[in-house]
Regions:
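Short, well-structured active-site flanking segments
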Residues: 4-10, 100-103, 126-144, 181-188, ...
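Active-site SXXK
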Residues: 57, 84, 105-137, 165, ...
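Glycine-rich, acidic and aromatic/proline-enriched surface loops and short helix-turn segments
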Residues: 33, 79-95, 126-130, 142, ...
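A penicillin-recognizing enzyme superfamily signal
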Residues: 47-68, 76-80, 89, 97-106, ...
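Non-catalytic, structured segments within soluble enzyme domains
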Residues: 1-51, 55, 150, 191-202, ...
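Active-site-adjacent helix/loop patches that line small-molecule binding or acyl-intermediate pockets
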Residues: 49, 74-75, 137-142, 153-197, ...
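Soluble, non-transmembrane domains of envelope/secretory-pathway proteins that act on or interact
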Residues: 280-462
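Conserved catalytic neighborhood of penicillin-recognizing serine enzymes
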Residues: 22-37, 131-186, 245-268
């Protein structure tokens, strides 16, 4: 009593109460969630987030998802390439959008990266002196012990330069180079950059990893690409400003000369339709079945990564990195307000030579001895049960947990199973298996054999 005078009480009581619902604050929600999980007892959290950049990129993500379609989410990560500090991160299109599962931080979810690892394959080839930018390499049908990669458009370009092969993201040339430099070595370089790619349990890295046959998150991809911005030196991503920045990995992921060659090529990739030429270097990727669209770009100071897809792993017909993710990448760079930083000067020993100036051995890349054009191969895998379009009553609506029998013909073990784009732990050697679904509804089942060949069926489980 006596704290507030009667006149003030009367005035406050006379104020009208407006029935207005105000939106919940959702600023940098996924970053805030992570900070609270890491330091739940802390009274104050100091983050590396730049408020202005964060707000602008959250708007970019939300508008892009609405433009692309329902149930689609967008994740964007912007980081300093030299320190790894995350300046902005939208883990989804809208944290409170239940239809897009906005509460899931898609920047940390492991997905297939599509072709976004190809620059590192070419980097190893440059480092080893196997090729230069104008080296001729074949883009023709090839057989690598039963693995027959095809280009995204199912067409072949014939003889192309290494520069063209990377800019066009041709699959066969990338696999040819990976077959020579070695998939185990590629994975080792990723680990050198502080990233551990996810492989099916018990499997060794194979040629398919160059085309997306491995699991990485958007944050991990952005971390790898900091090395392309900084002459091979990778910076570990972090979002806390009130703790010591994590120590960078020791050795460079690639030599400065190899990184310069990659950046020189990727900076010449045409921007997506309607986007301005910003002077950035960038690469796109699309996962198997149109489930994930990626684009990662960088200048001399920042790296931005974009992921587009459905959080439930469902396919989005026509969703590609170039058509869906790249326009968002360019918009994010343009609207970040950070400008475009010049790239480092060419390091000593970095040269760009015409084909006629190359040593004879570097004018054409020779296929490895393991590559064959006509080696016999067993039939591709086929899912014979359940058949395409089947409706299978497992009693799920009544609360039962009956498994679904799976059977395949053809293909070569070991096999990998995916349910709605996510790995399922089943026997890798047997052609029959039993899978217990999470619930009723439509499901897409995919099997991938040792040669990277895949078969899928869409079924409805009841």
């Amino acid at each position: 009593a006596g704290v507030i005078v009667d006149s003030e009480v009367a005035r406050a009581a006379a104020e009208p109460v407006l029935p207005v619902r105000r939106p919940l604050p959702g600023f940098a929600a996924h970053v805030a969630d992570a900070a609270l999980r890491e330091e739940p007892a802390a009274q104050r959290h100091q983050l590396t987030i730049d408020r202005g950049v964060q707000e602008r990129l959250e708007r970019v993500a939300k508008k892009a998802a609405a433009r692309i379609g329902p149930k689609v989410s967008v994740a964007i990560v912007l980081a300093r390439a030299d320190t790894g500090a995350i300046l902005a991160k939208a883990g989804s299109a809208d944290y409170f959008d239940a239809a897009r599962a906005g509460w899931i931080d898609m920047a940390r979810v492991v997905r297939s990266p599509g072709s976004t690892l190809k620059p590192f394959i070419y980097g190893l080839a440059f480092e080893d002196g196997l090729v230069m930018q104008e080296t001729t390499i074949e883009d023709r049908p090839a057989n690598f012990a039963g693995y027959r990669p095809k280009n995204f458009d199912m067409e072949y370009q014939g003889d192309v330069s290494v520069r063209q092969a990377l800019q066009l993201s041709l699959n066969v040339p990338a696999v040819r180079l990976l077959d020579t430099v070695g998939p185990v070595r590629l994975v080792a370089r990723m680990k050198r950059g502080g990233v551990t790619p996810t492989l099916p349990e018990g499997e060794r890295p194979g040629l398919a990893i160059g085309l997306g046959g491995v699991g990485l998150s958007l944050e991990e991809l952005v971390q790898l690409y900091t090395g392309l911005s900084q002459r091979g030196r990778v910076a570990r991503l972090h979002s806390r400003a009130d703790a010591a920045a994590p120590k960078p990995p020791g050795e460079p992921i690639l030599s400065p000369q190899a990184v310069w060659q990659i950046t020189d090529i990727l900076s010449g990739v045409a921007p997506p339709q309607g986007a301005p030429r910003l002077g950035i270097a960038y690469k796109t990727g699309t996962s198997y079945g149109y489930r994930d669209a990626w684009s990662v770009g960088y200048d001399g100071r920042h790296v931005i990564g974009v992921w587009v897809g459905r959080p439930d792993g469902g396919a989005v017909p026509g969703l590609t990195g170039y058509l869906a993710a790249a326009p968002i990448l360019f918009e994010a760079f343009a609207k970040s307000g950070l400008g475009i930083a010049p790239r480092p000067r060419p390091p000593a020993g970095a040269v760009r030579l015409a084909r006629a100036e190359l040593p004879f051995a570097q004018r054409r890349f020779a296929p490895s001895a393991r590559e064959s054009a006509d080696a016999p191969v067993e039939p591709a895998p086929e899912i014979v049960y359940p058949p395409q379009g089947a409706r299978v009553d497992l009693g799920l609506r009544a609360g039962a947990t009956m498994p679904l029998a799976l059977k395949i013909n053809g293909g070569r073990a070991p096999f990998r199973w995916l349910a709605n784009g996510r790995p399922v732990r089943l026997s890798a050697r047997r052609r029959t298996a039993a899978w217990t679904p999470d619930g009723a509804g439509a499901s897409t089942l995919t099997v991938i054999d040792a040669a990277g060949r895949a078969a899928s069926v869409n079924v409805f489980l009841e």
